[in-house]
């Protein structure tokens, strides 16, 4: 098969090219630079900065300082948007699981992503932080035009975010529709609950 994005065939493109096209992903287990601060983690994302070359490091220090100031300002705006500005100077390794998920979401904001794949964003996250993450995702979608593809098992989280919903099992699509339609689908019930449990529920 082929994968297209805005009409362009992106099948087989390497990760760095997908990144530059605005296609990003987060991971079920968050990956961060443990010993760096939350703000520094965000400032690392854009890449291709002037300070990366020895020539600029010696002869264009003013440009480097200006770029760093701009990145710092943008990182602080992202942290404010995500309601974790108070953690800017905290070591990323000290964050909770949910806070690390917010940090990963913040990374996508540093490069103005177009499409973001979220892999099991609710895994290991308490309910309060999960709803904070959901609110941030909704705002990014509605206010900034981000598109999210959410891979998730938490039905409350899906209900808050997703329309339509696609249910898959063993690599194939079982059903597509609203969450209510998915929950009522016979194939979905059988695949995830089993025929025995389905029949038991019907008798009860």
Descriptions of predicted regions:
Residues 1-8, 20-21:
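Conserved ABC transporter NBD signature motif
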Residues 52-87, 114, 135-138:
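Conserved ABC ATPase "signature" region
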Residues 91-95:
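Conserved ABC ATPase signature
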Residues 116-119:
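Catalytic Walker B motif of ABC-type/P-loop ATPase nucleotide-binding domains
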Residues 131-143:
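Helical segment within the ABC ATPase nucleotide-binding domain
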Residues 158-160:
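A short, surface-exposed alpha-helical micro-motif characterized by mixed small hydrophobic
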């Amino acid at each position: 098969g082929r994968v297209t994005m805005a009409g362009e065939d992106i099948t087989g493109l390497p990760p760095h090219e997908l990144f530059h096209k605005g296609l990003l992903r987060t991971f079920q287990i968050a990956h961060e630079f443990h010993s760096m601060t939350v703000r520094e983690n965000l400032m690392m994302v854009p890449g291709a900065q002037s300070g990366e070359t020895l020539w600029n490091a010696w002869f264009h220090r003013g440009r480097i300082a200006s770029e760093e100031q701009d990145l710092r300002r943008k990182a602080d705006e992202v942290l404010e948007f995500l309601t974790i500005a108070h953690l800017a100077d905290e070591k990323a390794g000290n964050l909770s699981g949910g806070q690390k998920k917010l940090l990963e979401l913040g990374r996508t904001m540093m490069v103005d992503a177009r499409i973001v794949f979220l892999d099991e964003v609710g895994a290991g996250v308490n309910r309060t932080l999960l709803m904070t993450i959901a609110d941030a995702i909704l705002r990014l979608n509605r206010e900034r035009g981000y598109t999210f593809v959410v891979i998730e098992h938490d039905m409350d989280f899906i209900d808050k975010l997703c329309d339509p919903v696609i249910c898959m099992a063993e690599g194939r699509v079982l059903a597509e529709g609203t969450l209510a339609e998915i929950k009522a689908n016979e194939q979905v019930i059988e695949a995830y609950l089993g025929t025995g449990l389905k029949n038991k529920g019907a008798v009860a």
